[in-house]
């Protein structure tokens, strides 16, 4: 909902006067209904203000969250080095182990 599209405020609704006719609406019923509408408007305004504040807070915290997330996704360098060395060792065993057994059979 865009702020530019809001046409009434709680005060506008409260101050609205309706013309009465011979068989018009019950003024008491209209007043009660308008009171409910005013309460809703006030509640919506409070909710919008709360959500705007929460939105600003989240916008400010987003860079910090992204930085901590990127740090947590990267494994420690020592772990990466260990994994690479283990793979290299297994590869050497596979390559040189086959050559060694082939030489013994000949």
UniProtKB/Swiss-Prot annotation:
It is found in: Cytoplasm. Its main location: cytoplasm. The keyword Cell division applies. Residues 34-67 form a coiled coil. One of its GO terms (biological process) is cell division. Residues 55-83 are annotated as: Disordered. Gene3D superfamilies: 6.10.250.660. Pfam families: DivIVA. Residues 70-79 have a biased composition (Low complexity). GO terms for cellular component: cytoplasm. HAMAP family: GpsB. PANTHER family: CELL CYCLE PROTEIN GPSB, CELL DIVISION PROTEIN DIVIVA. Divisome component that associates with the complex late in its assembly, after the Z-ring is formed, and is dependent on DivIC and PBP2B for its recruitment to the divisome. Together with EzrA, is a key component of the system that regulates PBP1 localization during cell cycle progression. Its main role could be the removal of PBP1 from the cell pole after pole maturation is completed. Also contributes to the recruitment of PBP1 to the division complex. Not essential for septum formation. Belongs to the GpsB family. This is Cell cycle protein GpsB. It comes from Oceanobacillus iheyensis (strain DSM 14371 / CIP 107618 / JCM 11309 / KCTC 3954 / HTE831). The gene is gpsB.
